[in-house]
């Protein structure tokens, strides 16, 4: 069996320049992560941090979008997900500049001396509720192992003065996250509200915070046009990644 045939049979997602297997990860590749990885500002970055790396999707997307000199650290608490992220990265063109760490981000941060120009996270956002099928799924869905104040604190401890901390969240939760971030000294610099189509209200929000004050740029992104095909804006944002776009 050829390698390509083997890869395509695995449980994962094929992009133009890399493949992400996610069968051992609690949270699968989805639109939220793809949006965040394509949207986060990468101009001039030298060092990136992916908090809660999961399958390694965001780290791989950042690697594709940045120069060969950029180093990316991907921190994942759950050992099976971290192992799969490492496998995905090893099979990518950027294995030498993405470092996977199986660690609790709150402990890992205390051991670091470098600061990051870009920090990215697709964080859990549900309060603990209905019990999940596995502890891994619960960890990925609920803010039990890393709540939002702790996440913001971790990012603040290792970001450069002009760096960006980027997240994707449901719209209402994103509004609360923004209020919390502002109260902790962060400044909102970029905001994109995401709607499925023009007729619907936004259901997701992409947020970029910085320690440095400055103008906040806001816009709206519609995923699908009237014909139900991907909109021009969504296509422009993601076409470097989607295989058939």
UniProtKB/Swiss-Prot annotation:
Subcellular location: Cytoplasm
GO CC entries: cytoplasm
Catalytic reactions on record: adenosine(37) in tRNA1(Val) + S-adenosyl-L-methionine = N(6)-methyladenosine(37) in tRNA1(Val) + S-adenosyl-L-homocysteine + H(+)
Pfam families cross-referenced by the UniProt entry: MTS
PROSITE patterns associated with the record: N6_MTASE
Family: Belongs to the methyltransferase superfamily. tRNA (adenine-N(6)-)-methyltransferase family.
Protein name per the record: tRNA1(Val) (adenine(37)-N6)-methyltransferase
């Amino acid at each position: 069996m050829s390698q390509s045939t083997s890869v395509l049979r695995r449980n994962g997602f094929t992009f133009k320049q890399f493949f992400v297997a996610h069968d051992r990860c609690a949270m699968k590749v989805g639109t939220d992560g793809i949006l965040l990885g394509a949207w986060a500002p990468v101009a001039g970055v030298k060092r990136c941090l992916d908090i809660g790396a999961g399958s390694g999707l965001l780290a791989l997307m950042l690697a594709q979008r940045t120069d060969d000199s950029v180093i990316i650290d991907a921190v994942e608490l759950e050992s099976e997900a971290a192992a799969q992220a490492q496998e995905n990265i090893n099979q990518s063109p950027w294995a030498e500049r993405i470092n996977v760490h199986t660690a609790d981000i709150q402990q890992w941060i205390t051991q670091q001396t470098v600061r990051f120009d870009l920090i990215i996270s697709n964080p859990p956002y549900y309060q603990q509720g209905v019990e999940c099928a596995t502890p891994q799924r619960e960890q990925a869905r609920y803010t039990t192992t890393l709540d939002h104040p702790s996440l913001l604190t971790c990012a603040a401890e290792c970001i450069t003065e002009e760096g960006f901390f980027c997240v994707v969240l449901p719209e209402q939760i994103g509004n609360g996250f923004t209020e919390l971030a502002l109260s902790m000294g962060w400044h909102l610099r970029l905001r994109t509200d995401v709607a499925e189509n023009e007729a619907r209200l936004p259901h997701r929000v992409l947020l970029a915070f910085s320690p440095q004050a400055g103008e906040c740029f806001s816009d709206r992104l519609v995923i699908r046009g009237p014909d139900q095909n991907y909109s021009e804006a969504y296509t422009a944002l993601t076409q470097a990644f989607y295989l058939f776009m």
